[in-house]
């Protein structure tokens, strides 16, 4: 007795795998990024010592060029502001798993990419360094993982993002008659 897969050519089978990858990879990526973001919230929103160390070092660095308070608890880039952005990104990534809300996943991926671009750059180019909490660089590694996964998700959801930006353009700059 032959099965359906016996009658498929290798090309048909690989096309099926590509289709499954395109369908399920964005959900897996969204899940990974969301888990990292949601796990970090317990540190940011409870003012954990690890968070105090990180944002304290960043605030000292900012003060060295006249931007004291930038990373303080009431600053523009405080742990609460960053944590809220991560919460919004995680929510959009997870809600975007539902087919009717795919565009939200694309927006969540952009927010995640932006937040993690900042995190990775601050780890690399400020006195914060890649191991501010003596955790072997685990925090930095997770930031890099989320940065890459969110970049991948932005790529996979590029059509949705193009539609969003086209709609914004039409709304903000209506055609003149």
Language-model-detected regions and their locations in the chain:
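Membrane-interface extramembranous regions
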Residues: 2-177
